[in-house]
């Protein structure tokens, strides 16, 4: 029977199965299938997906993300924080600031260490993009969608489209508890206007420095947290004139809080926790 070692980790409840591909070398042709297997709460471990920690030619490590439906994602903020914690605590890297390769490009992570353990991680998530071609989204490639009415058949909502290396559409409401994740999340995620799908965020603005946030993730559904989504929500709030750059913005997610800062140099910084749940052996 084939088996591999794994570590289950979470960032604010957004939990993945982490596999060190430098040791395990799971076969490429079976990665999607394995991701579905390990993610199952009935016949697997139970998770939002699987993240591989791989060798890289351009950075100390490369991160690959597989959602619980087997699709491969391009970026994951909570996953990046957990990868940073893993590689530092397993002495794959020794510097406290280092780069991680993703399908969206290189990102820089800084681990905050206390008693030899990483308790917080700051990740430079890069520059947001707003053009439809960056999402991608149907329409004029160079045009943007900022607080524009979008027709989803059963309803029309004003949305702001932001790419943080993966696609996000942000909607605002007055009460986050009324966010229609179950009903509208799957409809919007797979709507024709988003050829590659989209992450769906609902946001309640409390103040210039505080947001409430809920998410329906592309390929995973409702999750406790989404780091790139929190970045998209903060950036969207600023471009919609409800907050300012160079301000620490606390984003309250279902699983806890992230601190987001959109800097004057256009880079978005995300700071939050990363936790190890357990280690184990998975039998295929």
Curated annotation (Swiss-Prot):
Metabolic or biological pathway, per its Swiss-Prot or TrEMBL entry:
Amino-acid biosynthesis; L-lysine biosynthesis via DAP pathway; DL-2,6-diaminopimelate from LL-2,6-diaminopimelate: step 1/1
Q: What class of enzyme is it?
A: isomerase
Q: Where in the cell is it found?
A: Cytoplasm
Q: Could you say which EC number(s) this protein's record lists?
A: 5.1.1.7
Q: Where does substrate bind?
A: 14, 67, 77-78, 166, 199, 217-218, 227-228
Does the record carry Cytoplasm as a key word? Answer: yes
Q: Name one GO molecular function term.
A: diaminopimelate epimerase activity
Gene3D superfamilies the UniProt entry points to: Diaminopimelate Epimerase, Chain A, domain 1
List the residues marked with site Could be important to modulate the pK values of the two catalytic cysteine residues.
168, 217
User: Do you know which Pfam families this protein is assigned to?
Assistant: DAP_epimerase
Mention one GO biological process in which this protein takes part, according to its record. Answer: lysine biosynthetic process via diaminopimelate
Name where it mostly resides. cytoplasm
The GO cellular component terms are: cytosol
The active site lies at 76 (proton donor), 226 (proton acceptor)
Which reactions does this protein catalyse? (2S,6S)-2,6-diaminopimelate = meso-2,6-diaminopimelate
Q: Which keywords has UniProt assigned to this entry?
A: Amino-acid biosynthesis, Cytoplasm, Isomerase, Lysine biosynthesis
Per the record, the domain of life is: Bacteria
Which proteins does it associate with, and in what oligomeric form? Homodimer.
Similarity field: Belongs to the diaminopimelate epimerase family.
Q: Tell me, in a sentence or two, what this protein's role is.
A: Catalyzes the stereoinversion of LL-2,6-diaminopimelate (L,L-DAP) to meso-diaminopimelate (meso-DAP), a precursor of L-lysine and an essential component of the bacterial peptidoglycan.
* Protein name (record): Diaminopimelate epimerase
Per the UniProt record, the source organism is Bacillus pumilus (strain SAFR-032)
């Amino acid at each position: 029977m084939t088996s591999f070692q794994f570590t289950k980790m979470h960032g604010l409840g957004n939990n993945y199965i982490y596999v060190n591909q430098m040791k395990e070398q799971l076969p490429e042709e079976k990665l999607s299938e394995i991701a579905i297997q390990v993610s199952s709460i009935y016949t697997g471990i139970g998770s939002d997906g699987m993240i591989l920690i791989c060798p890289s030619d351009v950075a100390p490590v490369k991160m690959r993300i597989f959602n619980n439906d087997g699709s491969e994602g391009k970026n994951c903020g909570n996953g990046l924080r957990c990868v940073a914690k893993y590689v530092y605590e397993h002495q794959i890297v020794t510097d406290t600031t280092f780069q991680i390769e993703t399908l969206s490009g290189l990102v820089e992570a800084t681990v905050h260490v206390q008693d030899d353990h990483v308790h917080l991680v700051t990740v430079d998530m890069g520059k947001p993009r707003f053009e439809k071609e960056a999402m991608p989204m149907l329409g004029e490639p160079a045009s943007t969608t900022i607080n524009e009415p979008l027709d989803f058949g059963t309803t029309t909502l004003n949305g702001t489209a932001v790419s943080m290396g993966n696609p996000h559409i942000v909607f605002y409401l007055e009460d986050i508890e009324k966010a229609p994740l179950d009903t509208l999340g799957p409809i919007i995620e797979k709507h024709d206007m988003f050829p590659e799908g989209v992450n769906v965020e609902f946001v309640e603005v409390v103040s210039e420095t505080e947001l409430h946030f809920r998410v329906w993730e592309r390929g995973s559904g409702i999750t406790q947290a989404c780091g790139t989504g929190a970045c998209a929500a903060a950036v969207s709030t600023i471009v919609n004139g409800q907050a300012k750059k160079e301000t620490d913005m606390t984003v309250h997610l279902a699983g806890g809080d992230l601190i987001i800062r959109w800097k004057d140099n256009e880079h978005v910084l995300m700071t939050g926790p990363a936790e190890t749940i357990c280690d184990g052996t998975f039998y295929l």
